[in-house]
């Protein structure tokens, strides 16, 4: 491998000749060989750095054009566009397990953008610190990258995934109107419910999850940029924080604003805890929905068997013909991972000692993993399972009319205690509710038929 010599305040460092990073990134690679190749800083963070570095250059150009010249702005902007597009991903090697402020990742961005910008300009035009990092500190850039990436992940990935599954459930509601089945509570038979009503519960659950995520977004759309080292805004021109938030909004097409209190923005990660709580709620609800589906699909002969789900692949290496609810299992495993991530996010957020949180990389690594896994799992569940759900009408009808909980319909006519006696007799003697009720003398056969209509109990 060919190398070039880079230097920083600590001296010279050998850097791979074909990489845009420089001394500080190289030192981090050497000092933190933890999870290399497996737990790289999330690409969402890298791309967010591209956004905020371009925005900072735009703000600096408008506020102090004598330092951020047209030529420098053009070079930085083009390099940042390449960072945002992902075409420079290979030049961002650092792992999550580094300094808790994300300083090395900030410098990785500064070095790559400066060296690529110099290549674009055809001369030594940009300095990583003096130009690319102008009016910034790692302490306000990394929190800003966290919020930008979180907003993009939720708005562009998670919410569209929810919308897709909601649309499927709406279609299933319409298709299954008029089908009545046994309801179940405590995993025991309960009074009847329309299958469309059961599906509407799933749909409404997801709609509420979407509302909770949307409620978290305004908090995430506040940016720390402009606070610099400890929140005082040292070395920033007046109005930089407002200008840079406006520039981020222009670049992303999303409405960001500067944080009202930069001291809070640097040291507290409560907005991310709140937002991840909404992701955890979504995970819990997806766990419930997936479990409902696999219970209803259990069988085919010895389970509930009330719905059919798509047969996507062989289910067993030893039992021929077995088909398992694999999409449901994938969703539930994702839900477990998200619930574990919530603990990590909360613990990391609690480590904001004095003026700076120093658990930011691990906080965001888990947050973004949760958002990504949920979005992808929901789409997969929708496309490979939910879209193909079909009611087993015969099994639903059989289970409904075999349920002892239909006796609840008799309460107004024979009273609770007599209804309980009817159900117990029917169960003990393995006879129908009608036979039990008539034999106990509570109703005549004709009267029973007049008042007992399971399909009307919904």
Annotate each PLM feature.
Residues 1-458:
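Conserved, well-structured ligand/cofactor-binding cores
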């Amino acid at each position: 491998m060919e190398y070039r010599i880079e230097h920083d305040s600590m001296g010279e460092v050998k850097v791979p000749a074909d990489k845009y990073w420089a001394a500080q990134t190289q030192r981090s690679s050497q000092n933190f060989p933890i999870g290399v190749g497996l737990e790289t800083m999330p690409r969402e963070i890298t791309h967010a750095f591209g956004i905020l570095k371009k925005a900072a250059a735009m703000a600096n150009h408008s506020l102090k054009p004598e330092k951020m010249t047209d030529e420098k702005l053009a070079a930085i902007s083009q390099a940042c566009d390449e960072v945002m597009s992902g075409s420079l991903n290979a030049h961002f090697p650092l792992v999550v397990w580094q300094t808790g402020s994300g300083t090395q990742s900030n410098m990785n961005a500064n070095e790559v953008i400066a060296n690529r910008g110099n290549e674009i300009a055809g001369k030594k035009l940009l300095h990583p610190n003096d130009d690319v990092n102008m009016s910034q500190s790692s302490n306000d850039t990394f929190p800003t990258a966290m919020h930008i990436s979180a907003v993009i992940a939720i708005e562009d990935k998670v919410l569209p995934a929810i919308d897709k599954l909601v649309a499927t459930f709406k279609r299933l509601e319409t298709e299954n109107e008029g089908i009545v089945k046994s309801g179940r509570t405590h995993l025991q038979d309960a009074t009847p419910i329309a299958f469309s009503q059961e599906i509407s519960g799933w749909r409404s659950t997801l709609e509420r999850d979407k509302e909770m995520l949307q409620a978290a977004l305004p908090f995430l759309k506040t940016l720390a940029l402009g606070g610099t080292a400890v929140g005082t805004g040292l070395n920033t021109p007046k109005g930089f924080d407002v200008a840079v938030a406006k520039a981020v909004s222009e670049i992303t097409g999303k409405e960001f604003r500067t944080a009202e209190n930069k001291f809070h923005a640097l040291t507290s990660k409560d907005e991310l805890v709140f937002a991840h709580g909404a992701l955890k709620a979504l995970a819990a609800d997806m766990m419930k929905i997936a479990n409902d589906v696999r219970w209803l699909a259990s069988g085919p002969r010895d389970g509930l068997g009330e719905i059919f789900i798509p047969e996507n692949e062989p289910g067993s290496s030893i039992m021929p013909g077995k088909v398992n609810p694999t999409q449901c299992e994938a969703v539930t495993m994702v839900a477990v991972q998200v619930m574990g991530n919530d603990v990590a996010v909360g613990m990391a957020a609690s480590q904001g000692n004095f003026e700076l949180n120093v658990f930011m990389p691990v906080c965001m690594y888990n947050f973004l993993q949760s958002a990504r896994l949920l979005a992808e799992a929901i789409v997969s569940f929708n496309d490979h399972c939910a879209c193909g759900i079909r009611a087993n009408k015969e099994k639903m009808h059989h289970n409904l009319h075999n349920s002892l909980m239909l006796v609840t319909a008799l309460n107004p006519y024979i009273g609770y205690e007599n209804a309980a006696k009817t159900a117990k007799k029917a169960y003990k003697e393995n006879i129908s509710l009608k036979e039990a009720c008539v034999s106990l003398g509570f109703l005549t056969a004709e009267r029973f038929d007049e008042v007992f209509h399971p399909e009307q109990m919904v």
